[in-house]
């Protein structure tokens, strides 16, 4: 196996340069939520003599005034994780925003696309509308104040699709946001349901990206109990997988072929075991609707979907790229939750990727997909 020293030496000789940083020291690993290297700025990523601007499409934030509208349910919104305090970055808290930017610098991330995991899908229409209004206003403020460092996906009240259409229109055309962050379903209602089609039609019309970030399937809560936080480690990838498979098998992606979708966490399990889907209707025709005739094999829809690179190992990233293509993979970290401690190093150290592929994953694909031209 190639050592890290040998890889770095070889990479430098081949036109790829990067600065390796030990981002998480012992104090951070033992529970401190403060990043130990906030004053450290990584050297720029250089590929073939050109600087690569790195764009993280999967980063989170929260706003306390929006959460407060949840009433008695507000206490359950903040995730039970390291990095939870760093979610709160209102423009009015300059110190918090500067700490976020410093943490990005330490990771080598030039721009984050902020998003808020939907916590309002069970609320009534008016409450959800008020939460989304605050979220999108705060996200737009941050994006306007730091246009070279921060942009965002809007929040939507998808439990009221007609309202979501209006919110998306405003977010893209008036607030300068890049798309919308949505769950893996709307409180168990899957996205292929025709009630959601107006929202997908509007997203396609606007060229807006839909970032699917999962939530643990509530119907499996009993089985997820116990040690290991299985509701997240298994539940989240599973939720994304189910969401994507329904969009494929129910013909939603045929109906909206121009829909731009990014799936978090490498698309869940779909990228790892997609070929099984190509055989399901042959093996069990009774479980497939004869009125739904897909235009291509299920696996061929993967090149209509984008996947973040949050898959942890070089081998997992190699396999994801082999399955979906490097053009469909974008950088994602889940920041400020410390799932991915060395996102740039992860991509750079995956030796099966060409220089062009690494540059594309680190920022080129996201810039093209999100129409980011100010970096």
Where are these regions (language model features)?
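Mid-to-C-terminal alpha-helical segments outside catalytic/metal-binding sites
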Residues: 2-53, 57, 63-111, 137-144, ...
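Active-site gating loops and adjacent loop-to-helix segments of metal-dependent hydrolytic enzymes
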Residues: 51, 63-94, 218-240, 277-302
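Histidine-centered divalent metal-coordination motifs
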Residues: 58-60, 213, 265
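Active-site environment of divalent metal-dependent phosphoester hydrolases
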Residues: 62-64, 120-122, 159-160, 188, ...
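Active-site gating/metal-coordination segments in enzymes
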Residues: 110-250
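Alpha-helical structural signal in soluble globular domains
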Residues: 138-145, 170, 174, 198, ...
